[in-house]
């Protein structure tokens, strides 16, 4: 059963993968280890990324889906750690032309600890591919009512000119999505999908201007911009906060000068709890170790001074019930 609230860092399965055993692993502690052996005990879920190709014959950076499932699902169930299977991503597209293929795909990873299927739409998918995915989810969510189906979408965070904090535009809120996000939202409306969440990629806004983010001191304020993106989705598309999740990129983002700090984590988590959003994730688990500011790395945080698994633990603490 998918929990009402889900905190699950993204784990890029291709980073530090044990290619001999296909066991999802990490070097975040400085030593190559199965990821479950280094996951803090207060973090009970991971989002595993990314399955690409056609549903039912999907692969993970060339590893067959069946092989990856066989090597990892038993480990997650033995550890009683929940997981989301994430598809797509920036480097590859996930397609699904049939409901039978979607069933094969989901069943391959099924266990008591599978809590969600995530569709990360950022590889230039066609509108037809997106329409097909949404139609598959309409059927799948009836057959798998305990799973969460999320659409992870790139977003900007257009803010009120001159504002240094997020604030609601109300009915005049701009659309924060690119064409792919628009296509997802249109398909959800066209096909009447009800049981879904929208997971906003609150990162990489581009140049620091109010058309892109909440600006203070000439830089995008990453915590406030995450809040602004959520407000805009709520106000423009009418998505309730109870169907919304946020995924920042910790530390240095791909856009130079954008840095998501531990204080931004606190800001984001407070908004999430106050407004009843249903998920927080981040990109990505393997990056949660210090390295100096500079170009974004897939293996460290490009900010420094946070400590190994500092963001993982900060969010876990911030989001803990009763905090």
Language-model region placement:
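Substrate-binding cleft of extracellular glycoside hydrolase catalytic domains
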Residues: 57-165, 170-190, 194
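Short beta-strand/loop segments at the ligand-binding rim of alpha/beta enzyme cores
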Residues: 2-9, 80-83, 145-150, 239-246, ...
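N-terminal carbohydrate-binding/catalytic regions of secreted carbohydrate-active enzymes
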Residues: 2-111, 265-279, 285-319
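Substrate-binding and catalytic surfaces of secreted/luminal carbohydrate-active proteins
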Residues: 49, 54, 60-63, 147, ...
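Receiver (REC) domain switch-region micro-motif
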Residues: 46, 117, 198
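Solvent-exposed loop/turn segments at secondary-structure junctions
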Residues: 12-17, 50-55, 83, 88-94, ...
